[in-house]
Regions:
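C-terminal regions of RecA-like/P-loop NTPase motor modules
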Residues: 1-2, 94-97, 148-153
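Structural motif
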Residues: 18, 99-103, 140
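Conserved ATPase "switch" residues in P-loop NTPase domains
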Residues: 11, 39-40, 92, 131-133
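Phosphate-binding/switch region of NTP-binding enzymes
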Residues: 122, 126-153
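Conserved inter-motif catalytic segment of the P-loop NTP-binding fold
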Residues: 42-123
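The Walker A/P-loop phosphate-binding site
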Residues: 1-66, 86
């Protein structure tokens, strides 16, 4: 799993990046490791938002070592994207948060954009680019992509 973290293209400020996980366990692990890594490298706080109810799993995987920043984990089950965005902006503005990691973002688009998932991804990227570009915040979306099996007839 550590190899996955090392392969992530740098944490670029002001940019939305997508990372694919193989299952929900690896998704939580990636979020926790990235949050701990960012907290240690930048000496700052990180906000993690779990859109699929994995708050406890993420919190248990974050190393409890002494660091300057704090990792905040927000749990949002079956949320509306606008509500999540508003809550994230509130926390970012009140605390010294300089990175945002969202797990389960693809679940938001599958409900709204069932027929056109690519359009949903573009919509989310557009909304998050506005948040990240204004204050130079890196936003990382961790998503689960199961391998689709094609049935030949």
């Amino acid at each position: 799993m550590a190899e996955i973290i090392n392969q992530i293209p740098g944490y670029e400020k002001g940019r939305v990046q997508r990372i694919n996980a193989t299952d929900e366990v690896s998704e939580s692990f990636i979020v926790a490791q990235m949050a701990a890594d960012l907290r240690k490298k930048w000496n700052t706080s990180v906000l993690c938002i779990s859109l699929d109810g994995h708050k406890e799993a993420i919190e248990s995987l974050i190393p409890q070592e002494k660091a300057v920043g704090t990792v905040y984990v927000l749990d949002q089950k079956n949320p509306e994207f606008e509500v999540v965005l508003r809550k994230a902006e509130g926390i970012i503005n009140r605390r010294f948060v300089r990175a945002l990691i969202i797990s389960g973002a693809e679940r938001l688009t599958t409900r709204t954009f069932k027929e056109k998932p690519e359009k949903g991804r573009e919509w989310i990227d557009h909304r998050l680019n506005g948040l990240s570009g204004g204050i130079g915040l890196p936003i990382i979306l961790v998503e689960v992509h199961e391998e689709s099996i094609e049935v030949q007839s």
